[in-house]
Amino acid sequence: MRILAVDDDPVFLMLLEHVLTAIGYKDLRTVESGAEAMTLLRDPRQKFDCLLLDIDMPGMTGIELCRRVRALQDYHDTPVVMITAMKSLDFVEPAFRAGANDYVHKPIDELEMRTRLRMVGDLIEERRRRASVESRFSTDHGLPVINVRFDEPVALSEAGSVIDYLALENYALTLGRLRLYGHSVLGFKVTNAESIFCSTDGIGYIDTMANVASVIDGALKSCNHLIAHAGRGEFVAMISQRTDLDVDLLQDEIDLAMDRYAHLHEALGIPLPDVTVGRILHTGFFTRTSVSSLFKEARQSVRDVAMVR
């Protein structure tokens, strides 16, 4: 794994290099500003597998740098881990909105960094495997292709509040139990997602799920929220307040918005997505519900609603 680390503190970069070397990551390049990083990233002779970005830098912040990185075709889905010494979590959500995949605190803990980079490595290997399959198919048939599994939480980027599922889990983990108590979680399900998946190719399926994400994003516009596609046509939304939205009204708004795509889907021969809204969930103040369990509960909730709808 070739890593680029960006931080305006040269002493921290030396310490980071020491930690990374100790856990087996020796191919590291460091720079001290966002401008230097962008120069490297635009150089076709350079290629990095993972970016470690300090959030609080003078001039171009790490969040702005992350946003610019995501605009580069070669780094659209490269894993980005944000690093910061700031204690406030006010900037965490903007970092994930900008495209970050994960987040760690200074001072760097060796075990935490090892765990984060192991997850990054797994993500890189999965994306390399998919790219290899897509490349072979494209070479054999001369057609663009995206290799997608139905149960895979494929990344969608068309809507402003949509982030990767892993990133949403990582964001929720940064909140801690107290802050998580102040959030609401809501599941959505495209009940005919498997029919859509079978009726089109990977590009068509991702485009359709992206349209659904945009509709959900619009329906939740009155709330500060983040959305992720969890696979199998299911979505999880985190709302940054304890809310009791009228789920029936939300369902009606989504149905109405999806109807606007009816003519397009008819022309393409792809079933129009049938989206179901689940129940709004909250964590208890004294409970120790894990983030993964909370998200699973949200997905199960919408499955239950879909069965009786």
Task: Cite the ranges covered by each PLM segment.
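Conserved acidic segment of CheY-like receiver
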Residues: 1-20, 51
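Active-site residues of response regulator receiver
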Residues: 7, 54, 84
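Receiver (REC) domain active-site loop signature in two-component systems and cognate sites
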Residues: 57, 69
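CheY-like receiver
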Residues: 122-176
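Conserved long alpha-helical elements within nucleotide-processing catalytic cores of c-di-GMP signaling
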Residues: 154-173, 179-184, 191-217, 228-232, ...
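A short glycine-enriched loop-to-beta-strand structural element that forms part of the catalytic core
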Residues: 225-240, 263-297
